[in-house]
A protein has these predicted regions:
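ATP-dependent small-molecule kinase phosphotransfer cores
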Residues: 1-43, 71, 88-101, 121, ...
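Thr-Gly-centered strand-to-loop micro-motif
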Residues: 16, 47, 76, 115
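Short aromatic/hydrophobic contact patches that present stacked aromatics
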Residues: 19, 65, 112-113
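Small-molecule kinase domains that catalyze NTP-dependent phosphoryl transfer to phosphate-bearing small molecules
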Residues: 38-42, 50-55, 59, 82-127
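A mobile, often basic/glycine-rich helix-loop segment
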Residues: 68
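Conserved SF2 helicase motif VI
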Residues: 72-82, 86
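C-terminal alpha-helix
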Residues: 127-134
Length: 134
């Protein structure tokens, strides 16, 4: 399922996603929807999200915990959405997500941790393939 970048990433969505994600009913609905979607795809899928490997798909064959410096993340987000997300907003979202009661942001068990602060998309993909031995 593909949406335009403007629909997936904009400052308004980023700002409110942590608040919405705190709601247990929303989390359960999203989780069940994703699991149903996954079960309909026999070849598997690649999915991104802050608790995909820890809560939604804890038994996934491959889990990547992708991290980068906050300044770089801010620049990348600006490039994606055309609007600037300040470093402070990124820090606040991380703090909220790590400290929320329902499904806090954690490094999933058995995840491969990759810091791509100084890597291009292509270099990041190469490292993932290498570390997962694909």
């Amino acid at each position: 399922i593909s949406y335009g970048d403007d629909e997936l990433y904009n400052k308004n969505i980023n700002k409110h996603s942590s608040e919405i994600a705190k709601d247990p009913l929303v989390r359960e609905l999203v989780k069940n929807t994703l699991l149903t979607f996954y079960n309909d795809i026999p070849s598997g899928l690649v999915i991104e999200g802050r608790d995909m490997g820890s809560v939604v798909f804890p038994n996934a064959e491959f889990k990547i915990y992708l991290d980068a410096d906050e300044n770089i993340r801010g620049k990348r987000r600006e490039h994606q959405s055309g609007s600037q997300e300040t470093i402070e907003e990124i820090k606040q979202r991380d703090h909220k997500d790590m400290n929320r009661e329902e499904s806090p942001l954690v490094i999933p068990e058995n995840a491969v941790i990759i810091d791509n602060t100084n890597k291009t998309k292509e270099e990041t993909i190469e490292e993932i393939i290498e570390k997962l031995k694909l």
